[in-house]
Swiss-Prot record:
InterPro entries: ArgE/DapE_CS, Bact_exopeptidase_dim_dom, Peptidase_M20, Peptidase_M20_dimer, Peptidase_M20B. One of its GO terms (cellular component) is cytosol. Disulfide bonds: none annotated. It comes from Bacteroides thetaiotaomicron (strain ATCC 29148 / DSM 2079 / JCM 5827 / CCUG 10774 / NCTC 10582 / VPI-5482 / E50). Its cofactor is Zn(2+). Cleaves the N-terminal amino acid of tripeptides. This is Peptidase T. Zn(2+) 2 binds at residues 140, 175, 379. GO terms for biological process: peptide catabolic process; proteolysis.
């Protein structure tokens, strides 16, 4: 089975996660895919294959050299985003992309166009795997899984490439921020690992957001609107007032690079009670803490104006910037950087404007930066992946294994 065949098979599994269930895996269909992968890894002759009740699949490619070298790992997630359906994915290969519009769905006039997605033009002449416009593709992160498995197959078929012990891990629920929650780092048994979960070719990431979630509930007082003067407190208006207090320029659509933000993700309510939910993000830990303090200050300000208990805050940290855990072991970044250069890929070290399982794993004792998997426009109908990107990612995995063994 080729890399492409493997990827096309993997995306046929619907593995959408769901944060509302409170289970791990959050959806049983992820376990169906995990069982398939387990069978495939068994057929490939890998060792120490385990699949636990939470959907964490681990396996080993034994070393083919006698000298002691570090055990390293490669990790990818099995779930796809809750943002769009991953059921009945029908991929299509556009061979030798010519730089023009790609019609994904003619009857609904869904078009993947370089006018809206100029990154398409970086892949003229390449072979693109696209959707039919009705689902996401699932390259996030089934491209990563296909690349890891294909790299392991390549190493098995080329014993002249010397490598140490390699562990691979496939986990559920990354898309809902829970992929690392039940990941047994001790059982995985690596000195370090890489998630294959980045986007464009060359991406190498060891900085991510510090992240928190805030839920603010506003209580109102409902009376007949005809007799409401000096009596009614409309919780919707109080919520709107709170929203307006936050800086309008510090939102996702107006920030980039290392700039943090407050992101209003939902608002629900009526006169009696309204709830707003935010995610808070910043790469800088001090600025991150300051953002949380600002939320607390504004909640207190609302209560000063309308009465204690009008606004209540639930605030929780979600994950932290892995940079502080990676900097003491920067040789793992140097190795990935060198591997990319060795296979003709220009490394692009950049901060992640998001989080990865690797960030949480790094704080659990497994340093775990992120490497490109090659897909673009994740989480929607315009997602695509150039086949050549996946091939390069696979080559990087092979080269990392070779470089670690050569030191």
């Amino acid at each position: 089975m080729t890399l492409v065949d493997r990827f096309l098979k993997y995306v046929s599994f619907d593995t959408q996660s769901d944060e509302s269930t409170g289970l791990t895996p959050s959806t049983p269909k992820q376990m169906v895919f995990a069982e398939y992968l387990k069978t495939e890894l068994e057929s490939l002759g890998l060792e120490d294959i385990t699949l636990d009740e939470h959907g964490y699949l681990f396996a080993t490619l034994p070393a083919n050299i006698d000298k002691k070298v570090p055990t390293i790992g490669f990790i990818a997630h099995m779930d796809t985003s809750p943002d769009m359906t991953g059921k009945d994915v029908t991929p299509r290969i556009v061979k030798g992309y010519d730089g023009t519009d790609i019609v994904l769905c003619a009857e609904e006039n869904i078009i993947l166009s370089p006018a809206q997605f100029p990154e398409l033009l970086d892949h003229k002449g390449e072979d693109l795997i696209v959707t039919n416009g009705k689902t996401l593709l699932g390259a996030d992160d089934k491209a990563g899984i296909a690349e890891i498995v294909s790299a392991i197959v390549y190493l098995k078929e080329h014993p002249e490439i010397k490598h140490g012990k390699i562990r691979i891990g496939f986990n559920p629920d990354e898309e809902i921020g829970e992929g690392a929650h039940k990941f047994d780092v001790g059982k995985f048994g690596c000195e370090w690992a890489y998630t294959m979960d980045g986007g464009e070719v060359g991406e190498l990431e060891f900085e991510n957001f510090n992240a928190a979630a805030a839920k603010i509930t506003f209580k109102g007082r409902n009376v007949h609107p005809g007799y409401a003067k000096n009596k009614m407190i409309n919780s919707i208006r109080v919520a709107n007032q709170f929203i307006a207090m936050l800086p309008s320029t510090e939102t996702p659509e107006q920030t980039e690079g290392y700039e943090g933000f407050y992101h209003l993700i939902s608002i629900q309510g009526d006169v009696e009670q309204s709830t707003v939910s935010y995610i808070i993000r910043d790469h800088d830990r001090a600025k991150f803490e300051k953002r949380k303090e600002e939320i607390k200050r504004l909640v207190a300000q609302v209560n000063t104006e309308y009465g204690e208990g009008t606004a209540t805050l639930e605030l929780r940290d979600q994950y932290y910037n892995m940079r502080e855990k990676i900097e003491p072991v920067m040789h793992i970044i140097d190795t990935a950087f060198a591997a990319m250069e060795a296979v003709g890929v220009k490394p692009n070290v950049k901060p992640i404007r998001g989080g990865t399982d690797g960030a949480q794993l790094s704080f659990k004792g497994l340093p775990c930066p992120n490497i490109f998997a090659g897909g673009l426009n994740f989480h929607g109908r315009y997602e695509f992946v150039p086949i050549q990107n996946m091939e390069k990612a696979m080559n990087v995995i092979v080269k990392i294994a070779e470089l670690v063994a050569s030191k």
